[in-house]
Amino acid sequence: MRNRFGLKMAMLWSVLTLSAAVAPALVSAADKLPHFLSPKDADTYRQIFALQEDGEIKAAAMLIKTLDSDLLMGHVLSQKYLHPTAWRSSFKDLSVWLSRYNDHPSASRIKWLSDKRKPKGAKSAKAPKQGYLNGVGLSRPQSYRANIPESWKGRSAPRRTANIAKEIRRAIRRGHPSGALDIINNKSNLRYLTASEEAHLRGEIAHAYFIFGVDDKAVRAARQAIAKDTEQAFMGYWAGGLASWRAERFELAGSFFRTLAEMENAPDVLRAGAAFWAHRVAMRFGQPLQADSYMNIAATYPETFYGVMAVQAAGQRYEIDFSLPAITDDFRVWLAAQKGGQRALALLQVGNWTRAARELRYLVEEMPPAFQRDLIAFATRNHMPGLAFRLADLHQRDTGEQIYAALYPLLSEKTDFVVDEALVLAIIRKESGFYPLARSRARAAGLMQLMPATAAFIAQDRRYRRTHKHKLHDPTLNLHLGQKYIGHLLAEPHINGDLVRMLAAYNGGPGNLNKWLRKLDHKDDSFLLIESIPARETRNYIKGVLSYLFIYRNQLGQPMPSLLDLVAGQKADRRLASSQ
């Protein structure tokens, strides 16, 4: 997507309001979405879910007796059986549930628990229905690493080549670029590498030397990479330019950056970055025309971090269409005819968007392909951003079509933002892909991926470390604590409103940020700080969030002063600390 820029930006954001009606009457001529719960039952289910979430199982049981429809009882019981503190489920409870509701989205979790509770010699519970769509939408990478071996075909020992690359990268990860250099200089290893593969790996070693602050060795390794293959040593040019800039050898930096910026075969993220830094070099030498030419190259890659910065520096608006596909009558009829679709529509009546989205994930595999765009639009309009993002990402991979309103979804209009909305959305997109039930290996939970210890500190409530940690999957609570944590970080003396530093602390931890600020020679330059951070995940995180911030501010019609400040080499706009 490299079309030029204009002032026009279309944004069509319509919300389908689901008003209650006796099942299954139509909502309205415009929506044509059937309801399967009466107003009384919708309200009762809403109360039941809330009571059970708080552990009030007996009070919820009294309300269950007043229901006319049992359409959502599978969800009610799964919430009860999976509650972490208020109920201990027996194998019989779980087995009976699976015999009735194995097509529900909680079936896999119930099955796992039933296997743990199964008495010796007892028959296993019924298996969950297959076909559930797992996963979240994936973010565009903001870094580059070559595939080695470049090809497995026609090679004498491709496995050996892969192992050499693995050993070199392991040495780099462990902080030993010189050890990596020893591996690649071993003649018995070199014979398994093509010239371009050697150039790629030597470029990675050069970048490692830059990361560890050894700029002279970084430049030397960069030159060795370029000598092996001038057309493929992308990381060599990149690392050589960064190391030369930090060493204040600006003419040499310009040579590295300009060469990479003019390589049409270079990866987008590196070409955009090199062009942006070539612009900075030219401005330092008082060459505005040359600077503009390189800024224009960077701006042709608006989905990269440096492309975003270039667009902002040039005062351009990237033309983005935020309209959604129309939802067809055929899709509405099909959805209402599916048992899972009926439950999803009922859950939308209740206002339980997370459970509704999970029901729809079971329908994706059996849905006619012609309805793919319908479901994307339906999920986007009905407050299911995680599902919308996941489906739009898959759709983009399959067809190349970018449905931006789903790739960059919004939250409910009822969401309470106390920090800049675009910033919060950008962080959520990067952290969890808008999936409220997301949980990392490190135990970070929910939309904003909060650690239990962080939540306990921010809320001043130790229960979030243990008995209340499951509550972090509640979107409202997670957003509240996450925004409070952002405000806390921005107020820290060593961050002092700096957006780049705040993002580094949010991802890498405040302690690591303190260490990086002490040890890194970043010369109070935001871009150099980003590139110098040792943790690749944190570098990519900052670049990703700032790129998404650009698109969300565009979508919301907000100004972008913080990005312009970054381009000018200043600190980020501190007005992001409060909602605008």
Where are these regions (language model features)?
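Catalytic glycan-binding domains that act on GlcNAc-containing polysaccharides
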Residues: D70-M73, S78-L82, F91-A107, W112-L113, ...
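N-terminal leader/linker segments that initiate helical-solenoid repeat arrays
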Residues: L26-V76, A107, A125-K166, R170-R173, ...
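Bacterial N-terminal signal peptides
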Residues: A10-A21
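Solenoidal tandem-repeat scaffolds enriched in leucines and small polar residues
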Residues: W152-H200, E204-I205
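Specific register positions within alpha-helical solenoid repeats of the TPR/Sel1-like families, i.e.
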Residues: Q52, K80-T85, D115, P119, ...
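Helix-turn-helix repeat elements of alpha-solenoid scaffolds
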Residues: F49-K58, T85-F91, V136-Y144, I172-I184, ...
